[in-house]
Amino acid sequence: WNADNKPGISYISYTRLKEWKYTEKGWFCYELCVPEPPEVSEIMDGSCLIRIKPMTEEQCEMSERCVRGLGYQGQNLLCSNWNVENMSELDYNGMFEYLYGMKYGEKFNSEDYPNGIPKEEFESLIMEYLPITAEQIREYAVFDEENQTYLWARLGCFNYAPTFFGTSLPEVVDIKENQDGTVTLTVEAVSDMVICDDAVITHELTVRFAEDGSFQYLGNEILNDGIMHIPDYQYRIKE
């Protein structure tokens, strides 16, 4: 599916499949025949997912607007339970680069901030997307009081262990308008690596849209026993 939500063919290949299935949610899952131990020493991933059933235009718009820019690695907005009364466990230092990309449409360049992210810039961006005060951010995030900057570190082997879940793609599958003016988005984490699962977890993300088109995240709730399928979160920077 392209950016206009229309099907297209990007390439054609001919290969053997080990197994395949079509899910109720409209995904074609298949596993390629790849070398296996003892022929190779490391597991090769032959799993793939292709969406057959199209998403609605509104689902596509909300997915692109609210969740695709975040994903499930490097920050924990979508993979933890939180609300406006309980925001202390969010990884603010980790989420900054993702919110930066959503706001400015370009990748965060850490070389522009060799000594950390200035307090005003960091706090204003976080407060644009979350109902939180500057004082709370300084309390919850890793803040350099002496230099008045927030620390940032690139994801790497010392602060992140890659997981199949982390590479999952968030997709909005349902949209509910609440009486208080907020909107609850039902989101599924779709993974095409090894486990090949069209909903590793399902969670409800609550947002509030403003008349100017901006929005704030108000809370996230992981449904059923989904929290059991999420690896322990590694904070980008430890105090």
PLM regions and their residue ranges:
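Mature, Sec-exported extracytoplasmic domains of Gram-positive
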Residues: W1-E239
